Curated annotation (Swiss-Prot):
EC number: 2.7.11.26, 2.7.11.1
Post-translational modification as stated in the protein's UniProt record: Phosphorylated by AKT1 at Ser-21: upon insulin-mediated signaling, the activated PKB/AKT1 protein kinase phosphorylates and deactivates GSK3A, resulting in the dephosphorylation and activation of GYS1. Activated by phosphorylation at Tyr-279.
Residues with the Phosphoserine modification: 2, 21, 72, 77, 97
GO BP of this protein: autosome genomic imprinting; cardiac left ventricle morphogenesis; cell differentiation; cell migration; cellular response to glucocorticoid stimulus; cellular response to insulin stimulus; cellular response to interleukin-3; cellular response to lithium ion
Catalytic center residues: 244
Protein name from the UniProt record: Glycogen synthase kinase-3 alpha
Gly residues: compositionally biased ranges: 1-15, 25-82
Main enzyme class: transferase
Family: Belongs to the protein kinase superfamily. CMGC Ser/Thr protein kinase family. GSK-3 subfamily.
Ranges where the Protein kinase domain occurs: 119-403
Residue positions where Phosphotyrosine is found in the record: 279
Length: 483
């Protein structure tokens, strides 16, 4: 579930409870081997829900109406105050459309500043083991928002909140505000993340075409995947790994084709040398090193997942539909062949002596339909590599020839609308891999001197953040979950 509401479908997540936040209310995540959760329609049933692990919300806690910043915990570093319950008692969700709920919330980005925020038209659009997602309308601007409400452990900072507060990119769902509210039980505290609302998900868009026995237009595949890779390049430059890339977590506006990555409930700032849990990411999209139990993985697990999403859009179904953790590896081997000893060592050195059945790789051209563009197949094969370091980086993927059509002047969406903003790179984005900039910036947006032309167009380079915007900073030391 997400800004777009519940979607159902998709594979189950990890065996521990997972927050499949926005796009999909989780059914029960499979235990142990991570069997498919729930039973809703779509390939693999519903994904499991995952409780947002990690750290509890930092900084000033904004209470519900009347509580004041910090509530009983006090302002500043005193922690969040519970305030009143949200939604308030007596509000009949979906019925009392004119009733206004007012809370004191903290701005999602920038300096910690609290203000009163009023909502109307509150209704549930998804739920799971992690909590509930509501849709609401801001009373002042009439803008729709999604409110993700999760039970908060007062001992920890909330990792999802910490990460979302530092992210600011056009292809990432924006945190507008956050506030805390009390629950029905004594000392129960909830964190409410107020997020921009995006109506659809890539999962539901793809399912629409599949049900109609149609193939999703290749230009939409290009536009969606390009924006996904751009969002990954940004978060990876911040040291953040999403760890749950799947179609259900890719929000899209069906009219403009703008894509926004959502659900950072599994995301983590990866630090070299520090171990991470391997049982992460929804099964169909899990990188092989995770299946091998690696704990020192890198952000390239997101690239593998993105490769699975690309393949799924091209095929009309998941490329690796494993029934369990072990079967997931079998599905991968059926396509890529048995990994070599060196590839296994790169994924997890502890498995080098394990005996695997020797299976030859299936030719990529036979994996996909005959009409699949060769550039799409080439990109897929460069993403779905056993060796993590051999996978393309997200920006290298953006620069791939598969996306050249997007860089051509005059290219439009199939609905005859202009392309969404694809080239409004910030200085920070252009500093990630400068050698790629000559490809990433289309010729028609370059000045004669070779620099980017500054124009009012949404396709041009516009923002220039300070260097501090691109520092990967750790949260204030506190008791935290290291998974």
């Amino acid at each position: 579930m997400s800004g777009g509401g519940p979607s159902g479908g998709g594979p189950g997540g990890s065996g521990r409870a997972r927050t499949s936040s926005f796009a999909e209310p989780g059914g029960g995540g499979g235990g142990g081997g991570g069997g498919p959760g729930g039973s809703a329609s779509g390939p693999g049933g519903t994904g499991g829900g995952k409780a947002s692990v990690g750290a509890m919300g930092g900084g000033v806690g904004a209470s519900s109406s009347g509580g004041g910043p910090g509530g009983s915990g006090g302002g500043g570093s005193g922690g969040p105050g519970a305030g009143t319950s949200f939604p308030p008692p007596g509000v009949k969700l979906g019925r009392d459309s004119g009733k206004v709920t007012t809370v004191v919330a903290t701005l999602g980005q920038g300096p910690e500043r609290s203000q009163e925020v009023a909502y109307t038209d509150i209704k549930v659009i998804g739920n799971g083991s992690f909590g509930v997602v509501y849709q609401a309308r801001l009373a002042e601007t009439r803008e729709l928002v999604a409110i993700k409400k999760v039970l908060q452990d007062k001992r920890f900072k909330n990792r999802e909140l910490q990460i979302m507060r530092k992210l600011d990119h056009c292809n990432i769902v924006r945190l507008r505000y956050f506030f805390y509210s009390s629950g029905e039980k004594k000392d129960e505290l909830y964190l409410n993340l107020v997020l921009e609302y995006v109506p659809e998900t890539v999962y539901r868009v793809a399912r629409h075409f599949t049900k109609a026995k149609l193939t999703i237009p290749i230009l939409y595949v290009k536009v969606y995947m390009y924006q996904l890779f751009r969002s990954l390049a940004y978060i990876h430059s911040q040291g953040v790994c999403h760890r749950d890339i799947k179609p259900q977590n890719l929000l899209v506006d069906p009219d403009t084709a703008v894509l926004k990555l959502c659900d950072f409930g599994s995301a983590k700032q990866l630090v070299r040398g520090e171990p991470n849990v391997s049982y992460i990411c929804s099964r169909y999209y899990r990188a092989p090193e995770l299946i091998f139990g690696a704990t020192d993985y890198t952000s390239s697990i997101d690239v593998w997942s993105a490769g699975c999403v690309l393949a799924e859009l091209l095929l009309g179904q998941p490329i690796f539909p494993g029934d369990s953790g072990v079967d997931q590896l079998v599905e991968i081997i059926k396509v890529l062949g048995t990994p070599t000893r060196e590839q296994i060592r790169e994924m997890n050195p502890n498995y080098t002596e394990f005996k695997f059945p020797q299976i030859k790789a299936h030719p990529w051209t036979k994996v996909f339909k005959s009409r699949t563009p060769p550039e799409a197949i080439a990109l897929c094969s460069s993403l779905l590599e056993y060796t993590p370091s051999s996978r393309l980086s997200p920006l290298e993927a953006c620069a791939h020839s598969f996306f050249d059509e997007l860089r051509c002047l005059g290219t439009q969406l199939p609905n005859n609308r202009p392309l969404p903003p694809l080239f409004n790179f910030s200085a920070g984005e252009l500093s990630i891999q400068p050698s790629l900039n000559a490809i990433l910036i289309p010729p028609h947006l370059r000045s004669p001197a070779g620099t980017t032309t500054l124009t009012p167009s949404s396709q041009a380079l516009t923002e220039t953040p300070t260097s501090s915007d691109w520092q990967s900073t750790d949260a204030t030391p506190t008791l935290t979950n290291s998974s």
